[in-house]
Structure formats: C-alpha cells, structure tokens
C-alpha cells in the first residue's frame, strides 16, 4: 500500500479505504460484504471448468466427455490412469484442443480484467482495450517485430509481448492525453480518440502486412484474432507477463474503489491518484499486450464481461476484478467454440463472434451513456 501517502496515519488509511468501499457499494457498513461472494465465485469457477471440458471434447472428431477427463487427468503429476483411450484421441485432446482452450481462457480472462481496470481508472464505462486503441496498438507492436525478422525470443523469454506492450502503452498515453478535458474524461472524446488511434494503428499494421508477404498469415491472425495455431509454447510464453500483471491488478481492487471518487477526494483519503493510475494502466496494458501477441485483436470482451458482472455482483472492484477474470475466460472459450463449430469444416475468426455479440451491447451502453444511466 505504498501508494497511500505516508502523511496519512495508518488508522486513517484503513478508514479511508473502508469509506471508499462503502461509497462504491452504496452501503453504509462494509465489513460483512453483504452476502458471502464465495458461493457465486465457486459457481462461476465450476461453469468455467465445465466450459473447458465441453470445448475440449467438441470438434470435428467427437470425443466422449469421460475420455477427455481421463486424458487430462493422466497428464497431471501424481495421477496414473489406465491407458484405455485411443492414441489419436490423446493427441487431439492434449496437443491440439487443450492448448487452444486454455489460451482462449487466458486471453478472455486478461481482456475482461483489463477492461474492468480501464473502466475504473478512467471512470468511464465505455473504456475497453479494443475501443480505446490499446489492443490495436499492441497488435502494431507485435506486427513490427514479426515483419522485421527479428528473433521472437531471448533466452526462452518471448519478445513479442514486450513489443506489443510498447505499442499498447504508447496508444493509451495518446488517447489519455487527447481525450482528457481538465480533470474529466468525457465518453465522447474518449471514444473518438480511441477510434482515431485504433484506425491509425490498423492502417500501419495493414501496410506492414502488405509489404511483407512472407508473414501475411501471422499478421492476419494478429489483426483478426484467432486461436487456430495455439500451442503449449504460446500459452507458457504469456504467463511471465500475465501473472505479475494480474496480481498487481487484483491486489489493488480497494485502491481502484478510491479512484472512483473525485481525484481531490482521493487525495484527501490519502491516495496518490496519478501513481495509482500509472501502476494500474501499466499492469492492464502489459496483460493486454501479452494476450494480443498470441491471440490477436479480439474486441468487446473487455466491454461485455465487466458490465455483465457489474449488473450481477455490483461495482465493488474487490469482487468485480476476480469475477471478470473468471467470466471473461468462460465467455471467450465459448466464443471460440462457436467460431470453430458454427460453419464446419470452415472456421470463423473468433474476433467476428465477439463483435457480433459486442456491437449491439456497445450501442446499448452508448444509449445509456446519453441518458446518464450507467453506474
């Protein structure tokens, strides 16, 4: 909690955080947190686990659910299962489908959690990694490395997320600088600045794709978003970036509640708003960049999921962030399942599926913004 100013006594710091939490939840007393969130959280985790098993079992080669469970369990350390599953099924599940499903889940979790973070930091319900240009900026950074022919890894560490992170940070800095009006961030200017930055990044990415025909397929996957080339390597490469970023965000849920107040009020409560914003924006952008570097630009996950969670479980970021993470993973796993089964044997880019779900929802939210009926 070093972001809390040292001039504020520890007792006042705790009281300040409780005050912000109470204002965020709309309750006068917070210690009991109303009803326990654990049953609902465990239910969401159970739905996520069921989605993983379903998506891993369903495909052109249908595999029974019990066989899928046996195959997964047999690869876990310390568990021995009778080898009664055909080798072909084992290869399909472990080498093809499971890496794809887990990468889709990781990407959905990251995008949803980052979307909730951006919405809290900007105090704007339409902030989203895709809408404010962060995802397209990250895609531009990753594309620049791909077409340059530079090494994609250094001592086992993937460099694509770092390049994507540079593009994401530059994009969010430009959007924030252009859209800010005094101490406020109006919805209209935020969306317009995001559209401008996203359009510019997409134009440069398209130009690089046209100039480098040998890397067209790789860049195409980054632009549209797809998991059809997912591997265990891509999944593990993202973890060193995603896990620390997620830990930072989840541990600062209370401070994100404080940021929902006016900046001057936050300072009076002992919080340094600018340092907190920079930390959370950096963590959210790093996580988004890591996801974009392996999955491409997938829109509207960071918009749909946090709002759905907020409607069901309230705006308290201590609940909103972890629930967005779990629900985002479930949403993108099911979206990817639809993308690869709706038009078999062809496959639809998952970004198209999320756009079909997200655009009507975005228009609905935009209308509510005009009516001032958000939080």
What kind of region is each of these model predictions?
Residues 2-375:
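Alpha-helical transmembrane segments in inner-membrane proteins
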